[in-house]
UniProtKB/Swiss-Prot annotation:
Belongs to the MraZ family. The lineage of its organism: Bacteria, Pseudomonadati, Pseudomonadota, Gammaproteobacteria, Chromatiales. CDD domains: MraZ_C, MraZ_N. It comes from Nitrosococcus oceani (strain ATCC 19707 / BCRC 17464 / JCM 30415 / NCIMB 11848 / C-107). This is Transcriptional regulator MraZ. One of its GO terms (biological process) is negative regulation of DNA-templated transcription initiation. InterPro entries: MraZ, MraZ_C, MraZ_dom, MraZ_N, MraZ_sf, SpoVT-AbrB_dom, SpoVT-AbrB_sf. Forms oligomers.
Length: 149
């Protein structure tokens, strides 16, 4: 399970050093092989251990090709999927094509999502979290008012 948020630096060659606490898990579960693809809704990338991606990919392939939304989802997720591998130093080269499709800069937030990671530009991540927190507080305030708390 991948948990927590870690701020990392992307080097000049576009490599991201995966924290040691995750390297062993990635080595055991997928021999360091991962799939990186775009996110459908957010300006971030998704990083899946290969076995987790294969589960997602099977579900995507099973979607009906005559359905417009299903085709869009498959084109985005499968079409942008890149297989990457941890090098001997625990780094992953983030493909330039994928980096250019998001707002990834030098500082990256690696966000654990249980079975995968999200990769965010750290400033974009902070803005997104502030926006979501403000929205959640408004909704929570309404719910608490209804409960008379």
């Amino acid at each position: 399970m991948f948990r927590g948020i870690t701020t990392l630096n992307l080097d000049a060659k576009g490599r991201l050093s995966i924290p040691a606490k995750y390297r062993k898990s990635l080595g055991i579960c997928c021999d360091g092989k991962v799939i990186i693809t775009v996110d459908l809704l957010e300006p971030c990338l998704q990083l899946y251990p290969l076995p987790e991606w294969e589960i997602v990919e099977r579900k995507l392939v099973a979607l009906p090709s005559h359905n417009r939304q299903a085709r869009y989802i498959k084109r985005r997720l499968i079409g942008h999927a890149e297989e990457c591998e941890l090098d001997g130093h625990g780094r992953i080269l983030l493909p330039l094509e994928l980096r250019s499709r998001t707002e990834l800069g030098k500082n990256i937030s690696l966000v654990g999502q249980g079975n995968k990671f999200e990769l965010w530009d750290s400033m974009v991540w902070e803005r997104q979290m502030a926006k979501e927190e403000a929205s959640a507080k408004e909704e929570l305030t309404r719910e608490l008012a209804l409960l008379a708390l």
